[in-house]
Amino acid sequence: MSQSPRIAVVGAGLGGAAAAKLLLQEGFNVRVYEQAPSFSRLGAGIHVGPNVMKILRRIGIEDALNEQGSHPDYWYSRHWQTGDVLAQIPLGDYAVKEYGASYLTVHRGDFHALLVEALPDSVMAYGKFLTKVEDRGNVVVMHFADGTTEEADIVIGPDGVNSRIREELLGPELPKYAGYLAHRAVFPTPEVKAGMLPFDACVKWWSDDRHMMTYFVTGKADELYYVTGVPVEKWDLNDRWLESSKEEMREAFSGWHPTVQALIDATVEVTKWSLLERDPLPLWSRGRLVLLGDACHPMKPHMAQGAAMAIEDGAMLARCLKEVGAHNHELAFALYEANRAERASKVQRISHDNTWLRTNEDPSWCFGYDVFNVPLVEPKVKAAA
């Protein structure tokens, strides 16, 4: 193992943790560098579709997540005012039969904990905030805020929308404000009935310019989560995360259905944050550096597939490194990008447009995807200058 190329994963988020575990399973020499001092239960709700559950099966945490999460029978889309059903997408047993795994909603922190717990303590290095990375041709040197340096043969950057690895590849560039704020809250399921409707296990309420997505985040259905998309023309990107309030929510969703009002009334704490995007990048790798997840294709959360794309990226990158060998990393990176860029860009575009499942449509291209069995596409050969 000591002679194996040293693979550094910078960031132990969902995509980074999944990539690290899958690489370890393939026998690679992996070290994970995480800026947080320790693991903590962060985030709120998250969708985990069959396309991701098939990866978690390989990792070995599918059953545990199935036990933790809520399993909606349908994704409902409803009219903001009347509550009329705009779309009813079958999930539940249908998803298992048609797509090969379940569809669930769960607390992001609980999901993340399962992924991190799947990694040996010996590969984790906490308190490592990357300040600089140097690809010296034969080795990569990473500099951290604690004054330490580390070397690796390959550096994977699942380090988010403000990725240091992306900055090294393409230079500094601020992400674009998408023109929307999102509010989110997690709270105990209200005891009261909500207007004329019960609380659907998974529902998105739509108007012409804004929405609210709500679902349970536990198998017991004792915690509810909502996340919104509300247009705000200008925003100071220095204020990424802020406290919000019931009053602000009532103003943003004035006149909406009684069920939505009941959710706002039951809110304990609510925060808001700005939604950021980037245009598709001209490259995902160079030399010994490679990106995945939000580092190369950040997207609005309106398709509930952002984390899924990062985890799929990690799985495909591990597959490509196994396919051609880590010593041939540039070919592996080209193969990885050739097999991920089109799908990630499609999800990024649909997320931007915020049209996903607003009407009845076939989601099989998304949910039925199996990263381990999809035929690999060869990278395009660049024309000679």
From Swiss-Prot:
Signal peptide limits: 1-20
Cofactor entry: FAD
Q: Which reaction does it catalyse?
A: 6-hydroxynicotinate + NADH + O2 + 2 H(+) = 2,5-dihydroxypyridine + CO2 + NAD(+) + H2O
One Pfam short name? FAD_binding_3
> How is this protein's function tied to pH?
Optimum pH is 7.6 with 6-hydroxynicotinic acid as substrate. Stable between pH 6.0 and 9.0.
Manner of cofactor binding, per the entry note: Binds 1 FAD molecule per subunit.
Which enzyme type, at the first EC level? Answer: oxidoreductase
Q: Which GO terms describe its molecular function?
A: 6-hydroxynicotinate 3-monooxygenase activity; FAD binding; monooxygenase activity
Q: How does activity depend on temperature?
A: Optimum temperature is 35 degrees Celsius with 6-hydroxynicotinic acid as substrate.
Superkingdom is Bacteria
> Could you tell me the EC number(s) of this protein?
1.14.13.114
Binding residue positions for FAD: 15, 34-35, 47, 108, 130, 294, 307-308
**Catalytic residues?**
47 (proton acceptor), 215 (proton acceptor)
Q: How is its activity regulated?
A: Inhibited competitively by nicotinic acid with a Ki of 0.49 mM. Inhibited by thiol-specific compounds p-chloromercuribenzoate, DTNB, Ag(2)SO(4), HgCl(2), CuCl(2) and N-ethylmaleimide. No inhibition by o-phenanthroline, 8-hydroxyquinoline, EDTA, disodium 4,5-dihydroxy-m-benzenedisulfonate, fluoride, azide, KCl, LiCl, NaCl, BaCl(2), MnCl(2), MgCl(2), PBCl, ZnCl(2), CoCl(2), SnCl(2), FeSO(4), FeCl(3), NiCl(2), CdCl(2), AlCl(3), iodoacetic acid, hydro-xylamine, phenylhydrazine, semicarbazide, cysteamine, alpha,alpha-dipyridyl and urea.
Q: Which InterPro entries match?
A: FAD-bd, FAD-dep_Monooxygenase_BioMet, FAD/NAD-bd_sf
Q: Which UniProt keywords apply?
A: Aromatic hydrocarbons catabolism, FAD, Flavoprotein, Monooxygenase, NAD, NADP, Oxidoreductase, Signal
Q: Which GO terms describe its biological process?
A: nicotinate catabolic process
| Gene3D superfamilies on file | FAD/NAD(P)-binding domain
Q: Subunit details for this protein?
A: Monomer.
Similarity comment: Belongs to the 6-hydroxynicotinate 3-monooxygenase family.
Function in brief: Flavin-dependent monooxygenase (FMO) that catalyzes the decarboxylative hydroxylation of 6-hydroxynicotinic acid (6-HNA) to 2,5-dihydroxypyridine (2,5-DHP) with concomitant oxidation of NADH, a step in the aerobic nicotinate degradation pathway. Uses NADH in preference to NADPH as an electron donor.
Q: What name is this protein filed under?
A: 6-hydroxynicotinate 3-monooxygenase
The organism is Pseudomonas fluorescens
Name the encoding gene, please. nicC
